[in-house]
C-alpha cells in the first residue's frame, strides 16, 4: 500500500522539478538599459537632468567628454561604488554598469568641477 502512494508522488515531484529547471534554463538576466551622458560646457546632457530608475534595474551608463577644448572631466555616482576614475580627455568615453539599489537619491558628478552633476532617483513606480 505504501509503495503505491510513494512511487506516484515521487514521479510527480521529479516531473515538477524537471519542468521548473527547463523553464528557468533559458532565462538570462535582462539586458541593462543604456543611458548616454554627454559632458560639455561643465554640464551633463546640457542641464544636469534628474534620472529616474526602478529598484533592481540594471543601467549601463555611457559617459563621453564632448568638450571642444582641452577640458578634462570624470564621472562618479556617490553611494553606488562608482568612483571618479581617471580624467577623461575630450572624445574619451567611460562605460559603467550598475544595478540600482532598493531606493534613494544618489548624486552623479564630475569630481573636478563643483556644480557639474545631478541626481538619480531610485523608486518604485
Describe each PLM feature range.
Residues 2-9, 15-125:
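Extracytoplasmic copper-binding redox domains, predominantly the cupredoxin/blue-copper superfamily
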Amino acid at each position: 500500500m505504501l509503495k503505491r502512494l510513494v512511487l506516484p508522488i515521487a514521479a510527480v515531484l521529479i516531473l515538477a522539478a524537471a519542468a521548473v529547471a527547463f523553464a528557468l534554463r533559458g532565462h538570462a538576466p535582462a539586458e541593462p538599459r543604456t543611458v548616454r551622458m554627454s559632458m560639455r560646457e561643465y554640464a551633463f546632457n546640457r542641464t544636469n537632468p534628474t534620472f529616474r530608475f526602478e529598484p533592481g534595474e540594471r543601467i549601463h551608463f555611457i559617459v563621453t567628454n564632448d568638450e571642444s577644448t582641452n577640458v578634462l572631466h570624470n564621472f562618479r555616482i556617490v553611494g553606488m561604488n562608482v568612483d571618479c576614475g581617471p580624467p577623461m580627455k575630450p572624445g574619451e568615453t567611460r562605460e559603467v554598469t550598475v544595478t540600482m539599489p532598493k531606493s534613494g537619491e544618489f548624486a552623479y558628478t564630475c569630481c573636478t568641477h563643483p556644480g557639474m552633476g545631478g541626481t538619480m532617483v531610485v523608486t518604485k513606480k
